[in-house]
Design a protein with these regions (language model features):
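Mature extracytoplasmic/periplasmic domains
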Residues: 153-205
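Short helix-loop capping/hinge motifs at secondary-structure junctions, enriched
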Residues: 27-35, 67-76, 161-167
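Ligand-binding pocket segment of bilobal, Venus flytrap-like solute-binding proteins
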Residues: 50, 54, 58-61, 65-139
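Non-transmembrane alpha-helical segments in soluble domains
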Residues: 38-41, 67, 79, 98, ...
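A structural signal for short loop-to-beta-strand junctions that line the ligand-binding cleft
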Residues: 1-22, 38, 50
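Small-molecule pocket liners
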Residues: 18-21, 134, 152-155
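Short beta-strand->loop
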Residues: 12, 38-41, 125-149, 158-160, ...
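Extracellular/periplasmic catalytic domains that process cell-envelope and extracellular macromolecules
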Residues: 5-7, 13-17, 42-44, 102-103, ...
């Protein structure tokens, strides 16, 4: 597990990575129309964007990412301008945003990448239809740009744990090749262990 996926004092480390990506309507948004997260603030998308509530940790994470990249003044303007483009009041989870695009309420949203996989391979045929109507855009991918914002799922051992040895074995297993591949195959998350390649489905995105 690389240093950038660990806490400075090694009290926790990442087990998997989830990209916060743009999801767009397959037919209404052309390839190349949106390539950067900053472009969600463009007034041409007024009434086109859906979102879950800004108070959710996923959106707090992307806001922190933009703040770090642009600085406070520009980040605040970006947030206000993007909110002005909302098609409706923020509501629901990430899956609900894909459903809203499918149903024509909006054309663009932000989701964690693994929700797309969950919908694409859902046992519910209706949810598979939602996934079929959209595609993912990994933002800020141009040379020299910062790339998509990534959240992690992580693990650590509680200070007063009575089972530290067993807990350590569990965490070690979760970073093993077998477990890291399961993160991708079952939950469509990217491995934190750099020795493990993402699965074919993740690579195809």
């Amino acid at each position: 597990i690389p240093n950038y996926l660990r806490s400075p004092d090694n009290t926790w480390f990442g087990l998997s990575k989830r990209a916060r990506v743009i999801v767009v309507h397959n037919e209404k948004i052309a390839d190349g129309d949106i390539t950067r997260i900053e472009e969600l603030a463009d007034p041409k998308w007024k009434g086109k964007i859906c979102s879950r509530p800004g108070s959710h940790v996923y959106n707090r994470g992307i806001m922190a990412s933009v703040l770090a990249a642009l600085g406070e003044e520009k980040a605040e303007k970006w947030a206000k301008d993007m909110v002005a483009n909302f098609a409706k009041r923020p509501q629901g989870n990430d899956r609900a945003q894909v459903k809203a695009i499918h149903e024509g309420e909006c054309e663009i949203a932000l989701i964690n990448n693994y929700y797309f996989g969950k919908l694409k391979f859902s046992e519910d045929p209706e949810q598979r239809k939602w996934a079929e109507s959209v595609r993912l855009v990994f933002p800020n991918q141009a040379e020299g740009d910062r790339g998509a914002h990534v959240n992690i799922s992580g693990g650590g051992i509680a200070k007063f744990s009575k089972n530290k040895e067993e807990a350590q074995k569990l965490l070690e297993f979760l970073t093993s090749e077998k477990a890291q591949k399961l993160y991708g195959e079952i939950n469509f998350e990217y491995p934190a262990n750099l020795k493990i390649e993402p699965g074919d489905e993740l690579k195809s995105w």
